[in-house]
Design a protein with these regions (language model features):
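Extracellular glycan/ECM-engagement signal in secreted proteins
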Residues: 20-56, 105-174
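Fungal secretory targeting signals
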Residues: 1-25
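Short, well-structured hydrophobic secondary-structure segments
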Residues: 53-100
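Short glycine-aromatic motifs
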Residues: 8-11, 73-74, 117-118, 136
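Short non-domain terminal segments
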Residues: 1-2, 18, 31, 57, ...
Length: 174
């Protein structure tokens, strides 16, 4: 009985050791990158970089700028897209769930891991179709800068003239 208790304690201590978790996370992470718009249906929405626009404690909207120095650096951690906002907290890409029958929804960069299901293919960053992802959308919106949205794939949306469908290309920083 004492042997079993000792082994259980040993396994728990090893499993809780942060050294093992850090190594596992690092092996699943990609090189750092910026997300840059391409193939926009409106030319003025090409070559823009995603950055976190602060909207409240722990909350940011994903907006866009032509200034690469303002761009937020991202990386893929498994199937989570996370951002390095120079804080001790993880910041995750978070496409907001469809709750209001909208044809497109905002994308946020919030404290935490964010949504899972992201991957990179030949057209750039994608999200899970099972979550309703139908592509990326950029609109001139209320922050005084273009804002990033995702298209809800189960509708045939009609976008305002200030919006463009785009791809989010991955531009590695190192």
């Amino acid at each position: 009985m004492k042997l079993l208790s000792t082994l259980t304690l040993l396994v728990s201590a090893v499993a809780a050791n942060p050294m093992f978790h850090t190594a596992r996370q690092a092996s699943n992470a990609t090189k750092p990158f910026h997300l840059k718009t391409a193939d926009a249906s409106n030319e003025k929405h090409n070559d823009l970089y995603v950055y976190a626009y602060h909207t409240g404690a722990g909350f940011n909207d994903a907006v866009l700028t032509s200034d690469v120095d303002t761009a937020s650096t991202a990386f893929l951690n498994g199937t989570y897209t996370q951002f390095d906002l120079k804080t001790p907290f993880p910041w995750g890409f978070n496409p907001i769930a469809v709750t209001n029958y909208a044809q497109w929804e905002p994308v946020e960069i919030n404290v935490g891991y964010g949504a899972e299901g992201f991957f990179i293919n030949s057209t750039g960053l994608q999200w899970s179709e099972q979550q309703g992802f139908g592509g990326w959308l950029v609109c001139d919106w209320y922050h005084g800068a273009p804002q990033l949205f995702y298209i809800y794939r189960y509708d045939e949306p009609k976008f305002p003239s200030s919006c463009s469908t785009v791809n989010l290309q991955v531009e590695y920083t190192s």
